[in-house]
Amino acid sequence: GGISSFIHHQSHYLIDSLRYLTFKRLMKATFADALFYLFAISFGLIFANFMRVKITDLLPDIDMSTFKNTAAIDSVINSFNTLMAIFFIVTVTYFLLLVIFWAVFKGSFWSILMKRSYSMRYVLNYFWLSLLWLGIWTGIFIGSLFLFKDSVIVGVMLLFGFLFLHTSIPVYIVFTKENKIKHALKEGLSIAIGGIHHFLIPYAFIIIFYVGLMVSILFPLLRMATGGFAGIISGLFTIVFLVWCRVYLLEMIAYHAGYQMR
């Protein structure tokens, strides 16, 4: 009946995802994913430190005497305008670098999982898709800060964060298979939105599975680790788990949408 069919499908996704994710493929995909986060976080810290230095240089300590001096006020305003211009340039530069890292490393990640050719044409198309896709979602997140009240903004951000993750996976799966931007957006969103009911149980299973692994594996390891090593273990555990999650969802999408990985 329905229950036996449901159990069969879920076990099918799980078994096939574990069978497909060989040790070599897991290591290569994990390495590509880890490199993205390494570069993204490292450059983020570099730009953040750069802005901290600029703020210190351009905006001196301000006291009440500053507001009694017209020249001092003009100087502060000019410094603030300069700082805003620098902030804009740094933000745009970091966003473009982030898209490049996304195209190079996330593109490599999906090509590894789906056994697709990793070529310059593929990376360039991945870059243009990501520039459009991440640009749209960045605009949505920024716009939300101005459109929603403080009392609901956290919930709205969480909702949009979920929608971003939920729609991104099918979009990039379709793109990696076809290497066509327009088709990836159309078909990927169709799978994500039109077939959202297919994702609900797998999402619940992923959460339960993650909690179970944390309790049975991660927490015991962390109790034996010390200092920064504990952070490294947590990071690698999370990245490896997320690699499996995407293979698991890829198996589910392959079943319902007919997308073959092999």
Language-model regions, residue ranges each:
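Juxtamembrane "helix exit" motif at the C-terminal ends of alpha-helical transmembrane segments
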Residues: 40-56, 142-145, 212-224
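Long, highly hydrophobic alpha-helical transmembrane signal-anchor segments
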Residues: 22, 47-76, 121-153
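Selective recognition of hydrophobic, aromatic-rich stretches within alpha-helical transmembrane segments
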Residues: 84-112, 133, 137-183, 224-261
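Membrane-helix interfacial "entry" motifs
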Residues: 21, 25, 75, 79-83, ...
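Short, small/hydrophobic-residue-rich motifs at membrane-helix boundaries and re-entrant hairpins
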Residues: 28-105
